[in-house]
């Protein structure tokens, strides 16, 4: 009885080790982007992102900041450049060992290291200057929590769109790039 209980506990524990990382499909008006999220290295950030996906927050938001050779940012503004309400800010997990390289997804934030809510960005270049250096306001970095596993050609098309200034915002695409749907796969 004890042996079979131990064996069952071992098998169930082993299954957890090989559990697949969560994946999210972003359906945009320029094509689909599939993200794989690193739940082990960024558990707080992944839980936060998936909560926004589950409640439909990203549907109808746009990539509102696009800078070729840097990143594409979205998840917080609607097509009229109005901010979507967001939940409480989360702890910055930029010290997790993941780095801001091309194809990774990270949380956008203000100058406060622990101010990330819903906005995220996809790096289109290796942006090592965004990596964690120290647990200080200027050295904290931006928390990477996943990567693009399908649809990098879509990301590369988005990074090339024409942009302009819109009110207080710069690098805003002239034509809206809309996240039509975000679903956990």
Predicted feature locations:
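Hydrophobic h-region of N-terminal signal peptides that target proteins for export
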Residues: 9-18
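Bacterial N-terminal signal peptides that target proteins for export
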Residues: 1-6
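Cyclophilin-like peptidyl-prolyl cis-trans isomerases
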Residues: 17-185
């Amino acid at each position: 009885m004890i042996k079979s209980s131990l064996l069952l506990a071992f098998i169930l524990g082993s299954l957890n080790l090989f559990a697949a990382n969560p994946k999210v499909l972003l359906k945009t008006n320029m094509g689909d982007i599939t993200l794989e999220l690193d739940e082990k290295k960024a558990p707080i950030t992944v839980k936060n992102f998936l909560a926004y996906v589950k409640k439909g927050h990203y549907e109808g938001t746009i990539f509102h900041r696009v800078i070729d050779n840097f990143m594409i940012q979205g998840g917080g503004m609607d097509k009229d450049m109005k901010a979507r309400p967001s939940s409480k800010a989360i702890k910055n997990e930029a010290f997790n060992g993941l780095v801001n390289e091309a194809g990774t997804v990270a949380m956008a934030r203000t100058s406060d290291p622990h101010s990330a809510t819903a906005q995220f960005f996809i790096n289109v270049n290796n942006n090592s200057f965004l990596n964690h250096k120290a647990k200080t306001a200027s050295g904290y970095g931006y928390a990477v929590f996943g990567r693009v596993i399908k649809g990098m050609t879509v990301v590369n098309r988005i990074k090339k769109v024409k942009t302009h200034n819109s009110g207080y915002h710069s690098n805003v695409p002239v034509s809206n790039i809309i996240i039509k749907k975000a679903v956990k796969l």
